């Protein structure tokens, strides 16, 4: 099933019992978070708060609160089907050279489909049905959540931030949280290596002192939202990838005050600029780590214009100790990552990012070991191959007989197949998430890899133990006897 816009997706979820309308008044200050958190922990539906306190605009929460809804947003019926999305991305990232004309012809439709998914520019866009400018812009009219008691201000969480560097042909789209400072000012919290921050840095070098155009789309269609958080190859735009998921071109429209292009069906669009040197302290806010983050300076986004659809819906989320919505997204996207990694490292059998590890800080890899030191090659490959794993602090690599998703299995392997001195790889002074206060320096810390594989000659002088298993014939006889034993 494909969805042309957010409202189409909402209607489909509601028809399936996957969305619940909340008709009682609920306060965006803390109450929505508590309700969403309880429902998410129970694996419940997406929530549409129709009567947010102090505003007339409904709030959509927990949209991607189960892995299946993430898969549905990508146009798939099951989480398992996301492996096919990963295979497509793996192919587009590094296409295999055809071994003959037959293979070349088979690959041609894929490339044609990608080329056919270039975004379509439309002049008349739903996101510009209502236009507010200058003093009319007032973020207090949007029921922006304050998620936790220690949060300093309301926080925009699901904004798709659109930027364009001075020397780039293509726009960048990323999701960065934004602290509300006033009616038309928010703080743009992006880390230095992110696409938006790099565009801003390049702009300041090319146009010193001049305002940097920026746009934020809220409430885009699910394929576009998920395209912004998926490891799309650098050669493919997020909009083209969203088109592949949706099965139709992403419709964009030009901002009224700049050349930036935003999803035409978005519920709300914020247009404005960053002025070099205009910065403010951001935070503290409760984060996906389960802690409040440190206060840091980030640039201020001044909103000149706010456009929206008639009767707009505000799309929001909260972050906290896992499981939260980002953790659920991580569970689903885990299935997309696997084929991408296997394309580069065919020896990988499974790859798992436990949600309780903040969805990216710890990875468990199972592999078919082929030579001494092989596990160390794989762990180094995980850290370096995809930028999504730049902040993964712990990588556990073990054999294919271990279930990467069963902690009992993993811990048994760690305690029986590892020597701490021989099998730990520690790398110091590597990039670390700025939100990781456990690192000695902000943004810089260490990583550790655990070789939990059976050891080959050259890695050990000991005779390696053989796992205990019951004889299959005995197991079959006991199976046949079982019902008669009354056990």
Curated annotation (Swiss-Prot):
Annotated Gene Ontology cellular component terms = cytosol; plasma membrane
Give the catalytic activity. a 4-hydroxy-3-(all-trans-polyprenyl)benzoate + H(+) = a 2-(all-trans-polyprenyl)phenol + CO2
Q: Name one GO biological process term.
A: ubiquinone biosynthetic process
Q: Does the keyword DNA-binding apply?
A: no
Pfam families given in the database record: UbiD, UbiD_C, UbiD_N
Look up and give the membrane topology term: Peripheral membrane protein
> What functional role does this protein have?
Catalyzes the decarboxylation of 3-octaprenyl-4-hydroxy benzoate to 2-octaprenylphenol, an intermediate step in ubiquinone biosynthesis.
Protein name, UniProt field: 3-octaprenyl-4-hydroxybenzoate carboxy-lyase
Q: Which organism is it from?
A: Nitrosococcus oceani (strain ATCC 19707 / BCRC 17464 / JCM 30415 / NCIMB 11848 / C-107)
Q: Which gene encodes it?
A: ubiD
């Amino acid at each position: 099933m494909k969805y042309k816009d957010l409202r189409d997706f909402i209607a489909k979820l509601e028809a399936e019992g996957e969305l619940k309308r909340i008709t009682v008044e609920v306060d965006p200050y803390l109450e929505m978070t508590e309700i969403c958190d309880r429902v998410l922990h129970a694996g419940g539906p997406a929530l549409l708060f129709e009567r947010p306190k102090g505003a007339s605009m409904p709030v959509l929460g927990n949209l991607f609160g189960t892995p299946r809804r993430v898969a549905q947003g990508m146009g798939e019926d099951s989480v398992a089907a996301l492996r096919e999305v990963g295979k497509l991305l793996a192919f587009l990232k590094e296409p295999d050279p055809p071994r003959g004309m037959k293979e070349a012809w088979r690959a041609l439709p894929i490339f044609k489909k990608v080329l056919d998914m270039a975004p379509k520019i439309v002049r008349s866009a739903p996101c510009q049905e209502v236009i507010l400018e200058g003093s009319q812009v007032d973020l207090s009219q949007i029921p922006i959540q304050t998620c936790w008691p220690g949060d300093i201000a309301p926080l925009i969480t699901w904004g798709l931030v659109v930027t364009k560097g001075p020397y780039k042909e293509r726009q960048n789209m990323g999701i960065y949280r934004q602290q509300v400072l006033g009616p038309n000012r928010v703080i743009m919290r992006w880390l230095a290596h992110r696409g938006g921050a790099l565009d801003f840095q390049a702009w300041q070098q090319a146009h010193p002192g001049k305002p940097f155009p920026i746009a934020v789309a809220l409430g885009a269609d699910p394929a576009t939202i998920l395209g912004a958080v998926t490891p799309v190859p650098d050669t493919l735009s997020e909009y083209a990838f969203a088109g592949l998921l949706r099965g139709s071109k992403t419709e964009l429209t030009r901002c009224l005050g700049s050349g930036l292009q935003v999803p035409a069906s978005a519920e709300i669009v914020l247009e404005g600029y960053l002025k070099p040197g205009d910065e403010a302290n951001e935070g503290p806010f409760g984060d996906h780590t389960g802690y409040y983050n440190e206060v840091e300076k980030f640039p201020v986004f001044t909103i000149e214009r706010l456009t929206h659809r008639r009767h707009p819906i505000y799309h929001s989320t909260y972050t906290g100790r896992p499981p939260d919505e980002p953790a659920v997204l991580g569970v689903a996207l885990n299935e997309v990552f696997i084929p991408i990694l296997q394309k580069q490292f065919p020896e990988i059998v499974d790859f798992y990012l436990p949600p309780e590890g903040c969805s990216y800080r710890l990875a468990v890899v199972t592999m078919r070991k082929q030579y001494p030191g092989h596990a160390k090659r794989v762990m180094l490959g995980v850290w370096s191959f995809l930028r999504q794993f730049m902040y993964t602090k712990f990588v556990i690599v073990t054999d294919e007989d271990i279930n990467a998703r069963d902690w009992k299995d993993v811990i048994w392997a760690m305690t029986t197949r590892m020597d701490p001195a021989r099998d730990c790889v520690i790398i110091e002074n590597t990039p670390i998430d700025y939100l990781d206060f456990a690192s000695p320096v902000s943004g810089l810390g260490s990583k550790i890899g655990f070789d939990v594989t059976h050891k080959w000659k050259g890695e050990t002088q000991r005779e390696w133990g053989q796992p205990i298993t019951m004889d299959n014939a005995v197991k079959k006889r006991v199976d046949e006897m079982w019902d008669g034993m009354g056990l």
